[in-house]
Amino acid sequence: MDASTKTKKGAGGRKGGPRKKSVTRSTRAGLQFPVGRIGRYLKKGRYAQRVGTGAPVYLAAVLEYLAAEVLELAGNAARDNKKNRIIPRHVLLAVRNDEELGKLLAGVTIAHGGVLPNINPILLPKKNEKAATTTKSPSKATKSPKKA
């Protein structure tokens, strides 16, 4: 056999052929989050002696869903405040106003998020008194200038 007639072995098989483009597990699962990296973290973290092949795919899908949910709500909060850019304040408002996400992230502090606006109902003026005082005040004000 001549060295010139030899073809390089590739993914095509024994005879060689064009090298096929590798397909990531994230692409196969239709995800944006990195399945391989999450699998590596699961192994490196020693959460269990062995990690199944489906575990990092499932975890990546769950993380991607949660991220998409938070971003969707934060984007809505930014639009409500007439802003084009999501800031930590919008993330906090989105998470705290959503019942399920608020329960999931109850013990989480979001840096530069601030607090939810809240006034205790006891401190607010009563509607009946406010309506009564506003109707009486203008009538007295109109009578007093006529004296002079």
Curated annotation (Swiss-Prot):
Family according to the record: Belongs to the histone H2A family.
InterPro entries cross-referenced by the UniProt entry: Histone-fold, Histone_H2A, Histone_H2A/H2B/H3, Histone_H2A_C, Histone_H2A_CS
PANTHER family referenced in this protein's UniProt entry, alphabetically: HISTONE H2A
Positions of region (Disordered): 1-28, 127-148
Function, in words: Core component of nucleosome. Nucleosomes wrap and compact DNA into chromatin, limiting DNA accessibility to the cellular machineries which require DNA as a template. Histones thereby play a central role in transcription regulation, DNA repair, DNA replication and chromosomal stability. DNA accessibility is regulated via a complex set of post-translational modifications of histones, also called histone code, and nucleosome remodeling.
Stretches with biased composition (Basic residues): 1-23
GO MF, any single term: protein heterodimerization activity
Oligomer status and interactors: The nucleosome is a histone octamer containing two molecules each of H2A, H2B, H3 and H4 assembled in one H3-H4 heterotetramer and two H2A-H2B heterodimers. The octamer wraps approximately 147 bp of DNA.
Keywords, ordered alphabetically: Chromosome, DNA-binding, Nucleosome core, Nucleus
Biased composition (Low complexity): 131-142
Motif (SPKK motif 1) on chain: 137-140
CDD domains according to UniProt: HFD_H2A (cd00074)
The protein, known as: Probable histone H2A.1
PROSITE patterns, per the entry: HISTONE_H2A
Organism classification: Eukaryota, Viridiplantae, Streptophyta, Embryophyta, Tracheophyta
Subcellular location: Nucleus; Chromosome
Cellular-component GO terms for this entry: nucleosome; nucleus
Motif SPKK motif 2 per UniProt: ranges: 144-147
Annotated Pfam families: Histone, Histone_H2A_C
Domain observations: Contains 2 SPKK motifs which may interact with the minor groove of A/T-rich DNA sites. Phosphorylation of this motif may regulate DNA binding. This motif is reiterated in both termini of histone H1 and in the N-terminus of sea urchin histones H2B, but its presence in the C-terminus seems to be unique to plant H2A.
Signal sequence bounds: none
